[in-house]
Swiss-Prot record:
The gene is esdpG. Heme binds at C434. It is found in: Membrane. One of its GO terms (cellular component) is membrane. Keywords: Heme, Iron, Membrane, Metal-binding, Monooxygenase, Oxidoreductase, Transmembrane, Transmembrane helix. It is an enzyme of class 1 (oxidoreductase). The chain crosses the membrane at residues 10-30. The lineage of its organism: Eukaryota, Fungi, Dikarya, Ascomycota, Pezizomycotina. This is Cytochrome P450 monooxygenase esdpG. Pathway: Secondary metabolite biosynthesis; terpenoid biosynthesis. Its EC number is 1.-.-.-. Its cofactor is heme. GO terms for molecular function: heme binding; iron ion binding; monooxygenase activity; oxidoreductase activity, acting on paired donors, with incorporation or reduction of molecular oxygen. Pfam families: p450. The keyword Transcription regulation does not apply.
Length: 493
């Protein structure tokens, strides 16, 4: 960070940044034109593979006979190749991320801050996956605190913003597990954890409008990139303070009362005699977890509002299982209807329109003769998630769909929310699938148990909250309002 500050000082970034801001205004029309062109290319790609309006989310009529189509500079590949491509070492996962997220630019490097960071974040996710029973109580505690403070006990209908509520709830839950009790309720830290992701996304989008050869210079002056570096500096103050306080208290990873990634990662780093950037690691964890899980929660709550007949059966399942098995991870696994609802919501509205982004390291010929050129970026389409030849009545939300599949021996191995298959790639597919999906599932289930038992809720305006596409992403309208009121609980937590 001192190096970056020195560079900015030597280059006189303050006035140059102002100049770039003015210049940005003069070329605004060009950037908007490129964005519209990119959107048009995306819609053309979907039009080539589908017999429906690309702006619609009803993809039940997706064609089955397409193989590849262009998506900007990348090649969109049919799901038929998912199993073949998923673990092919000739297709680089790392380079795909670098191209999509510009991970080598200062201020953007939190996604990959060196090989140790790559491994340690993966290890952290795997660590939590093996100790999920220890996170249920902390997650429940934070959910109770958040809902009490932000949703309240009012038994009359009142409104809260759907997406913002889910985002900040998940931000607090993940902060409890990633950085600990010291900061998980701190508004400034939660602002950093949520804001950095969106600011980073905007900076990448802005940088990608420039010639790649200019990016190593341009990023020093663009206000969006400077803002990210300032955010990292601010985050560093929070993280360094917590680490210093813990060292003074001689807190170790063996402290059974502490369950958070920072404590555990510090321990691993000491064991491996490695140094690492704790701040960038925390931002990377937040980048990977907060908005993705918040988006998932937004969509499943909206789906329940649109399918209210699912709410009472879910409440009965939750009450029955917790009453018999207690409030622990094993009980959450027995909630097969809740699990099915989560998986169905993700099938109907996954995070985006493609997954498995890769860069070819050499010319590749797939089994059917399809050619992939060296250096070409390929992405697997998610259109199969809405294909009626795979999913009966694919356009319809069926909360019982995956619960029914559990009784079918041919389908039972891939029905849980966290399971992976070529036909449902909500968490990716292959060895690079989301390592944090087990933790995300526990977070979502804990939060939903509290929401369902403590509150009645409904969308204020179903039309205004409809799902929509923005570029390659599938969103719920962030302006949607949720009407809520406190209800009488029928269980003791």
């Amino acid at each position: 960070m001192a190096f970056y500050s020195a560079v900015e000082a030597v280059l006189g970034v303050t006035w140059l940044s102002a100049l770039f801001t003015l210049g940005s205004l003069s070329v605004f029309w060009l950037l908007r034109h490129r964005e519209r062109k990119s959107q048009h290319a995306l819609h053309n790609a979907w039009a080539q593979i589908s017999a429906f309006d690309p702006s619609s989310l009803d993809r039940s009529k997706t064609a089955d006979d397409w193989k590849t189509t262009r998506l900007g500079k990348a090649t969109l590949v049919s799901n038929r190749y998912a199993h073949e491509i998923r673990n092919d070492e000739r297709l680089s996962f790392q380079l795909g991320l670098e191209q999509d997220f510009l991970t080598t630019v200062p201020g953007l490097e939190s996604l990959f801050g060196g090989t140790f960071h790559n491994g340690i974040v993966w290890d952290a996710a795997m660590h939590f996956s093996r100790k999920l029973n220890t996170v249920v109580d902390p997650l429940s505690e934070e959910t109770i605190e958040y809902l009490q403070k932000n949703w309240g006990d009012d038994k009359e209908w009142h409104t809260v913003p759907l997406h913002h509520s889910m985002l900040m709830l998940i931000a607090q839950l993940t902060a409890r597990l990633f950085i600990g009790e010291e900061l998980c309720r701190d508004p400034e830290w939660l602002g950093i954890a949520t804001g950095y992701t969106m600011d980073r996304t905007f900076a990448v989008k802005e940088l990608q409008q420039w010639n790649p050869r200019l990016i190593p210079v341009v990023h020093w002056f663009l206000p969006s990139c400077r803002k990210l570096r300032a955010t990292i500096k601010k985050a560093r103050g929070f993280v360094d303070r917590v680490r210093t306080e813990r060292k003074q208290k001689k807190t170790t990873a063996d402290d059974t009362n502490r369950v958070d990634a920072m404590t555990w990662i510090d321990s691993v780093a000491r064991d491996q005699n490695c140094s690492y950037d704790a701040t960038l690691t925390q931002l990377r964890l937040a980048y990977a977890a907060v908005h993705t899980t918040g988006d998932m929660m937004t969509k499943v709550v909206a789906a329940l509002c649109e399918n209210p007949e699912m709410i009472e059966p879910l409440r009965k399942e939750i009450i029955s299982i917790i009453s018999e098995h207690g409030w622990r991870e094993a009980a959450l696994h027995k909630m097969t209807l809740l699990d099915s609802v989560l998986k169905e919501s993700q099938r109907i509205q996954p995070l985006g329109l493609y997954t498995l982004s890769r860069i070819a390291l050499e010319p590749i010929t797939l089994d059917d003769g399809t050619q992939i050129k060296k250096g070409e970026q390929v992405k697997i389409s998610t259109d199969h998630m809405w294909n009626s030849s795979i999913w009966p009545d694919a356009a319809q939300f069926d909360g019982y769909r995956f619960q029914r599949f559990r009784d079918n021996p041919d389908q039972s191995s891939a029905v849980s929310f966290v399971s992976l298959s070529a036909n449902h790639m909500g968490f990716g597919y292959g060895k690079h699938a989301c390592p944090g999906r087990f933790l995300a599932a526990i977070e979502a289930k804990v939060a939903l148990c509290h929401l369902l038992l403590k509150y009645d809720f409904e969308l204020e305006n179903k039309e205004a909250s409809a799902a929509q596409t923005e570029g390659v992403m599938i969103w719920r309208d962030h302006r949607a309002q949720l009407r809520i009121k406190r209800r009488v609980e029928k269980i003791e937590w």
